[in-house]
UniProtKB/Swiss-Prot annotation:
Subunit comment: Homotetramer; dimer of dimers.
Protein name: S-adenosylmethionine synthase
Superkingdom to which the source organism belongs: Bacteria
Residues noted as binding Mg(2+) in the record, renumbered to the chain: D17
Gene: metK
UniProt-annotated binding residues for K(+): E43
Amino acid sequence: MKKWLFTSESVTEGHPDKIADQVSDAILDAMLEQDPESRVAVETLVATGVAVVAGEVTTKAYVDIPRIVRDTILEIGYTRAKFGFDGETCAVLTSIDEQSPDIALGVNKSLEAKNDGKDKYDIIGAGDQGMMFGYATNETEEMMPLPIVLAHNLARRLATVRKERIVEGFRPDGKTQVTVLYEDGKPIGVKTIVVSTQHDPAMTQEEIEQLVKEHVIKAVVPEEMMLDGIETFVNPTGRFVKGGPAADTGLTGRKIIVDTYGGWIPHGGGAFSGKDPTKVDRSAHYMARYVAKNIVAAGLADRVTLQIAYAIGVAHPVSFMIDAHGTEKVALEKLEKVVKEVFDFRPAAIIDKLNLRRPIYKQVAAYGHFGRIDVEVPWEKLDAVDELKRAFNM
């Protein structure tokens, strides 16, 4: 029997980096709502008393960026200066240029299209080079690794008890971390839980610990999942009053492991938020998850990792890899062949298949882009299962 521990973390919507992600995606959604063809690459920085939005945009839409920034920050819960940040009074600075014409050359007309390609999906070239990964497993209902599922659920619950005033005195910033014991590739139980929550200065450490255990941890982690001798750390520094952008500068794209699989598989390095779907950093990651999830749901493997790579301005991927980690129920060579036949990984085909030119991104800018069962997103659908099964006469 092989045993090991694996740990993943999540953060609340009030974490500075997540504020930035949500602002960037709120701006993207507003532009896509008016102009689905918008080209958007928007980065956000939040710091003490200020939010800065910069990037490259080509769109027919008119968007009141400062208002979107403020509304997003207020919705998260930064509504009073004593919380360290106030969406109504913070300064908002913007610096927006149009998309580089050199990049647009390759995105507007791919290398294949320039070489007289007549296929409609050859028109759009990848918006950048890079490699993207997708993963799915049958170990949880979400088809995600258990550590990241629990970490997200704890972070989301932390926000819920604050927003619904189940607990008084919690503030928006917070982090969670979960360590799970695995045995022969299967999760056995939870070994360690870490929860840190920003709080009112009048609250005592003992009070915070009791409230977190009662209203957050018990509500998320079933008792039978907790191993004997489980360690629980609540605000282990002993104080977390100063939080949010007043304590740490937040930037778009700094929580890419939280956004994906909690470190379970490799990551190509590209962030999601603030990017329209011509950016394969976003769309190809979503497609890789969609394909992996359908493979596992079809019973072709217990868990699977995909890697796709692109060259800027070229529609077809330059490489494709599939690894079932020894859990495949069919020949791996045939599985790769079938996947390439059933799914089209060119950017225009991905955008069309998943209907990505819509304002659907802010809702996944916190608590993970994958394994979401609380919102409906196209890359989590299981509508390719039957086609995959037919290919293997199942």
